[in-house]
Amino acid sequence: MDARDIILRPVITEKSTNLMDDKKYTFDVLLTATKTQVRNAVEEIFDVKVKSVNIMNVRGKDKRVGRYTGKTARRRKAIVALTDDSNDIKIFQENTEDNK
């Protein structure tokens, strides 16, 4: 399995952006991904050293539109902590004059 198939997207919330100051990054990952697979994928894609990986399963929420009910998709979230000597991961694009 390719590393880019395991890491789906970064999670951008207030809590996850506060964790970035401590070199902890949050990603949505494949539902079947293990900690070892997430560690190897992050190290390969971003060229960093991973200290630890914490994974949690987030259940889908019940949603209603009128009388119809449904569920949002469940997901798997990984919080990846980098070593102190590792480079930061650039999730946001730098704002330059050409990027307006």
Curated annotation (Swiss-Prot):
Quaternary state and partners of this protein?
A: Part of the 50S ribosomal subunit. Contacts protein L29, and trigger factor when it is bound to the ribosome.
The answer on whether this UniProt entry bears the keyword Transmembrane helix reads no
Keyword Ribonucleoprotein assigned to the entry: answer is yes
Where is it found, in Gene Ontology cellular component terms?
ribonucleoprotein complex; ribosome
Which NCBIfam families does the entry link to? PRK05738.2-4
Q: Which family does it belong to?
A: Belongs to the universal ribosomal protein uL23 family.
Role of this protein:
One of the early assembly proteins it binds 23S rRNA. One of the proteins that surrounds the polypeptide exit tunnel on the outside of the ribosome. Forms the main docking site for trigger factor binding to the ribosome.
Instruction: Give GO terms for biological process.
Output: translation
Can you say what this protein is called?
Large ribosomal subunit protein uL23
Q: Which UniProt keywords apply?
A: Ribonucleoprotein, Ribosomal protein, RNA-binding, rRNA-binding
- The superkingdom of the source organism is Bacteria
Instruction: Please name the source species.
Output: Lactobacillus acidophilus (strain ATCC 700396 / NCK56 / N2 / NCFM)
Q: Which gene encodes it?
A: rplW
GO MF entries: rRNA binding; structural constituent of ribosome
